[in-house]
Amino acid sequence: MDGTPGHDDMPGQPAPSRGESLWAHAEGSISEDVILAGARERATDIGAGAVTPAVGALLCLLAKLSGGKAVAEVGTGAGVSGLWLLSGMRDDGVLTTIDIEPEHLRLARQAFAEAGIGPSRTRLISGRAQEVLTRLADASYDLVFIDADPIDQPDYVAEGVRLLRSGGVIVVHRAALGGRAGDPGARDAEVIAVREAARLIAEDERLTPALVPLGDGVLAAVRD
């Protein structure tokens, strides 16, 4: 015995639940290289959101499983999620990433260059995602990743499903909203929008969905 108090011995510090322990283990099990760490630091500096390492690893896996030749991303941030997606894509795969903030796109371009990713492998588009997505071709993407304002999730989901080829995957981050999405008493605009996006996916007979408890909730679905 070393005399160090455990969770049960520390006043005011209840032991974490099993779910909390599993989440902490999953989130702490993934390490990032110096390129990703730098992109994450820049994202923090400018207040841009970034997926957790565990969500990033999931994106890499899904990009690889889906074929990873053509991927679309809504919400570039500083390039953290883009780096993870590209790491799972084919060597000739192209990431199309959309953000309304020029500074986000600049930092993402910097991150991709630092990772040795050539300009032919990325297409960075500045603009409102609702408008840009309508210009992308039907059934042309292996994966569509949505990590943007929860209010707009229903619009992005509708367009994202249209973009998927057969066997393609749509991935929606911030599907839990810190647990509020599953709280029957929560009825604010963000919660309503996130629930509507989840309903659109659940009721689409072409999709097979699953909700993954990583980051702020990841809703993924594969198209038949």
Swiss-Prot record:
Q: What's noted on cofactor binding?
A: Does not seem to have metal cofactors; no metal ions were found via inductively coupled plasma atomic emission spectroscopy, and the residues that bind metal in homologs are not conserved.
| Key words of the record | Methyltransferase, S-adenosyl-L-methionine, Transferase
What does the entry give for GO biological process? Answer: methylation
Q: Where is this region: Disordered?
A: 1-21
**What function is annotated for this protein?**
Probably specifically methylates an O atom of its substrate.
Its EC number is 2.1.1.-
Q: Answer yes or no on keyword DNA-binding.
A: no
Q: Could you tell me which SUPFAM superfamilies the record lists for this protein?
A: S-adenosyl-L-methionine-dependent methyltransferases
InterPro entries linked to this entry: Cation-dep_OMT (IPR050362), SAM-dependent_MTases_sf (IPR029063), SAM_O-MeTrfase (IPR002935)
Q: What's in the misc comment field?
A: Was identified as a high-confidence drug target.
The root-end lineage is: Bacteria, Bacillati, Actinomycetota, Actinomycetes, Mycobacteriales
Sequence similarity:
Belongs to the class I-like SAM-binding methyltransferase superfamily. Cation-dependent O-methyltransferase family.
Which PROSITE patterns does this chain map to? SAM_OMT_I
Q: Which residues form the active site?
A: 173
Ligand binding (S-adenosyl-L-methionine): 51, 75, 80-81, 99-100, 104, 129-130, 147, 156
- Basic and acidic residues compositional bias, start-end: 1-10
Q: Which GO terms describe its cellular component?
A: peptidoglycan-based cell wall; plasma membrane
What binding partners and quaternary form does the record give? Homodimer.
Q: What is this protein called?
A: Probable O-methyltransferase Rv1220c
Q: Under the GO molecular function aspect, what terms does this record hold?
A: O-methyltransferase activity; S-adenosylmethionine-dependent methyltransferase activity
